[in-house]
Amino acid sequence: MKTEELSDREILDIVRPLAEHTENAWNEKCYSDFVRYFLDEDPAEHFPEEEFNRQIEENYDIYGKHTIADLVAIHRNPDHVIVLWKVDLEKRAEPGLLIYGFRKHNGQILIEGCSYHA
């Protein structure tokens, strides 16, 4: 993903819908939607549905739904971009942190990795 000529707004216009889709899939507890935009050609190999369900079971009751909030930073690399957002957590007053990596693959921008820290 060549980002040199893109503004922060242009980058966010491309990647935020992917992150929002993924967070909504987490909120709906839907594995297939969660991994839909992952770069990994076989997400089940590196992030199997069992691991998704384990994380839901461990964390959902504690934090509830995720809502992407304020932008923290955009880190540009020559071939990919990392975006950090605050994430509002339904069951906690303090926000968490979302970290998403995005990369262009076969003409499409996809999620290289994502995590949240609460």
Which stretches of residues belong to each language-model region?
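Surface-exposed, charged secondary-structure patches
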Residues: 54-101, 113-117
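Short, charge-rich amphipathic alpha-helical segments embedded
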Residues: 43-55
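Short, well-ordered alpha-helical segments enriched in acidic and aromatic residues
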Residues: 27-41
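Short, low-complexity N-terminal intrinsically disordered segments enriched in polar/charged residues
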Residues: 1-28
